[in-house]
């Protein structure tokens, strides 16, 4: 396994560990999710470059589109939670309340 794949797997693991450890604040969870998506994008782009298939070129682009949608929804949710509750704690996000 090349050295760059080991670095990307380490970044992916660090982002996942950060998501598990810092899940009390919404902003830190969103940052860890972005790191996770960026690591997945780089890994899929490098894999696509290594395979030389023309049909697999669109996979990293589609992944970035989903990452941008996730970012927009996450920031909208963060702004809504901050305006309603005054903080960005994930525990304020209770979907069972009316």
Swiss-Prot record:
Keywords: Electron transport, Membrane, Mitochondrion, Mitochondrion inner membrane, NAD, Respiratory chain, Translocase, Transmembrane, Transmembrane helix, Transport, Ubiquinone. It catalyses: a ubiquinone + NADH + 5 H(+)(in) = a ubiquinol + NAD(+) + 4 H(+)(out). GO terms for cellular component: mitochondrial inner membrane; respiratory chain complex I. The chain crosses the membrane at residues 2-22, 30-50, 61-81. Its EC number is 7.1.1.2. It is an enzyme of class 7 (translocase). It is found in: Mitochondrion inner membrane. It is a multi-pass membrane protein. The keyword Transmembrane applies. Core subunit of the mitochondrial membrane respiratory chain NADH dehydrogenase (Complex I) which catalyzes electron transfer from NADH through the respiratory chain, using ubiquinone as an electron acceptor. Part of the enzyme membrane arm which is embedded in the lipid bilayer and involved in proton translocation. This is NADH-ubiquinone oxidoreductase chain 4L. It comes from Bradypus tridactylus. The gene is MT-ND4L.
């Amino acid at each position: 396994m090349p050295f760059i794949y080991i670095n990307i797997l380490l970044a992916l693991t660090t982002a996942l560990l950060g998501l598990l450890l810092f899940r009390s604040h919404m902003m830190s969870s969103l940052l860890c999710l972005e790191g996770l998506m960026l690591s997945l994008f780089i890994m899929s782009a490098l894999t696509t470059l290594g395979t030389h298939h023309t049909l697999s070129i669109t996979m990293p682009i589609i992944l970035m589109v989903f990452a941008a949608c996730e970012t927009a929804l996450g920031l909208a949710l963060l702004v809504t939670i901050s305006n309603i509750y005054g903080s960005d704690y994930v525990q304020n996000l209770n979907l069972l309340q009316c």
